């Protein structure tokens, strides 16, 4: 019990009390609207978002003043010539302040992460996992486990839950009131923080703001798993964010300790499973174990009850699916993963006698869900729902080489991401769709037929759809001497993969 209390102990001195005045500092908005920050994988460039570099502390002060008035964010006729924002609606002003507000709200998380590193609570960056730690887990661990649970992260039943979550980090009342205003201003934000939505699908106008809310929500949901990982040396945690694994329960300590004081030691043995593994990416995570089905059901029951009673999160039991790895494929990271039992007969000769011995080996397989992938390609308007390629509309000033490079790059990126698949032949259908869609697009542009266009381009057109592996192998090996089937059956996990491919993210 003392260990639990020590883990949950709050350091009140680190809570931030004076964040609200930062809203009136111009450098905050320079950070929020900087090209370098917004040019990352999560943010679109500034010109795509519609910023016009006219942010100033004076305008921000006026906007915040209007927030406290009855008709907030309504620009009067007299102010139209003064502020220079003629033609912008109120969403722009709220967007501008919310982006700066998100930068400010990230400060407590950043300070805690830095202080943890200084106190050597985090050995190097072992706890700051990424998508790359999931790949070796699949290769080395999963084939030795029996059961897997697919779990969708529960979402709040009310927007106030998000405010209460951040209240444990921040004691600045004006900042929390402003957060409430933003949440009610964008009422659809509750639908954005759902398990089926990925981080990359957030609203482009407020990506930083909603990404911060999503991470703080996941941060809270993972708190119980982080503590249990400390109780079991084999409970691995993988996360796609930097600060998501450093979790404290904060304001829930007293209630949590009172509830668990009597029966915590009785139930802790349940979680000390030396073969339990936890992996999360975006809005979905899995629990895999070598234990029995009964153990997995107990995990499910405790997680649901814990989230509902102590975090006030709505977590339906039907969102947690328990299945055996041997006869069930689960979807994760754009793959259909499963464990198959491969049997083989070995003939042993001993003197004059010979024996046939059947051996069984667990083999981990990752397959490309071709039907769902075609659905994603159809949603991107490269084909119809039945997989028949169609032409896409292009700009009149686009050159043929630019169009071909665009289609070829889409396929190479998709093939590069699915290089970890056990059977890459299924991607041939996607190559056919993209190649013919490109040909139809070019034929439509030149008002010609697909047959005539392909005849004119010849092999130059086909080479654009070769992957990097195929290009290298074609230079090193003769086509008739290299066993091509091996290149389609070997899994390769590339370290430059930092997030799930957009077309593969069809969940």
UniProtKB/Swiss-Prot annotation:
Q: List the subcellular locations.
A: Plastid, Chloroplast
Its chief place of residence is plastid
- An example Gene Ontology biological process: RNA splicing
The molecular function terms in GO held by this entry are:
RNA binding
- Give the residue range of the signal peptide: none
Task: Kindly provide the name given to this protein in its UniProt entry.
Answer: Maturase K
- Which organism is this protein's natural source? Liriodendron tulipifera (Tuliptree)
Family per record:
Belongs to the intron maturase 2 family. MatK subfamily.
Keyword field: Chloroplast, mRNA processing, Plastid, RNA-binding, tRNA processing
Q: One GO term of the cellular component aspect?
A: chloroplast
Known function: Usually encoded in the trnK tRNA gene intron. Probably assists in splicing its own and other chloroplast group II introns.
Q: Pfam families in the record, alphabetically?
A: Intron_maturas2, MatK_N
């Amino acid at each position: 019990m003392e260990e639990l209390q020590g883990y949950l102990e709050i350091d009140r001195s680190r809570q931030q009390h004076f964040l609200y005045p930062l809203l009136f500092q111009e450098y905050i908005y320079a950070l929020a609207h900087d090209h370098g920050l917004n040019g990352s994988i999560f943010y679109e460039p500034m010109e795509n978002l519609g910023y016009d570099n006219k942010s100033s502390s004076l305008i921000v002060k006026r906007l915040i003043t209007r927030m406290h008035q009855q008709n907030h964010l309504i620009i009067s006729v007299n102010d139209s010539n003064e502020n220079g924002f003629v033609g912008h609606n109120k969403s722009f002003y709220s967007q501008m302040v919310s982006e700066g507000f998100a930068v400010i709200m990230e400060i407590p998380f950043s300070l805690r992460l830095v202080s943890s590193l200084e106190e050597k609570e985090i050995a190097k960056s072992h706890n700051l996992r990424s998508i790359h730690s999931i790949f070796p887990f699949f290769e080395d661990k999963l084939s030795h486990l029996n059961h897997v649970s697919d779990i969708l992260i529960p979402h709040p039943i009310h927007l106030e839950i998000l405010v209460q979550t951040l209240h444990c980090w921040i004691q600045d009342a004006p900042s929390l009131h402003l957060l409430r205003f933003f949440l009610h201003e964008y009422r659809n934000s509750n639908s954005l923080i759902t398990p089926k939505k990925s981080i990359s699908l957030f609203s482009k106008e407020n990506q930083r703001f909603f990404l911060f809310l999503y991470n703080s929500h996941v941060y809270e949901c993972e708190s119980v798993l982080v503590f249990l990982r400390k109780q079991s040396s084999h409970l691995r945690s993988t996360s796609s964010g930097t600060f998501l694994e450093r979790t404290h329960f904060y304001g829930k300590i007293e209630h949590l300790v009172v509830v668990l004081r009597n029966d915590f030691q009785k139930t802790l043995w349940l979680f000390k499973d030396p073969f339990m593994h936890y992996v999360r990416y975006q809005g979905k995570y899995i629990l895999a174990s070598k234990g029995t089905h009964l153990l997995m059901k107990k995990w499910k029951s405790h997680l649901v009850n814990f989230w509902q009673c102590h975090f006030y999160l709505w977590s339906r039991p039907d969102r947690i699916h328990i299945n055996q790895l041997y006869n069930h494929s689960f979807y994760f990271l754009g793959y259909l993963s499963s464990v198959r039992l491969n049997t083989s007969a070995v003939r042993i000769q001993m003197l004059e006698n010979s024996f046939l011995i059947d051996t069984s080996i667990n083999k981990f397989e990752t397959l490309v869900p071709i039907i769902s992938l075609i659905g994603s390609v159809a949603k991107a308007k490269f084909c119809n729902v039945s997989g028949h390629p169609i032409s896409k509309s292009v700009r009149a000033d686009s050159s043929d080489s630019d169009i071909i490079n665009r289609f070829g790059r889409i396929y190479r990126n998709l093939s590069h991401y699915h290089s970890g698949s056990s059977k890459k032949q299924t991607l041939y259908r996607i190559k056919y769709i993209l190649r013919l869609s490109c040909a139809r697009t070019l034929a439509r542009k030149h008002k010609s037929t697909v047959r005539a266009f392909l005849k004119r381009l010849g092999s130059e057109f086909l080479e654009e759809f070769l992957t990097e592996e195929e290009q290298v192998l074609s230079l090193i090996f003769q086509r008739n001497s290299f066993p091509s089937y091996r290149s389609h059956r070997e899994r390769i996990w590339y370290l430059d993969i930092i997030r799930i491919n957009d077309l593969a993210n069809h969940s």
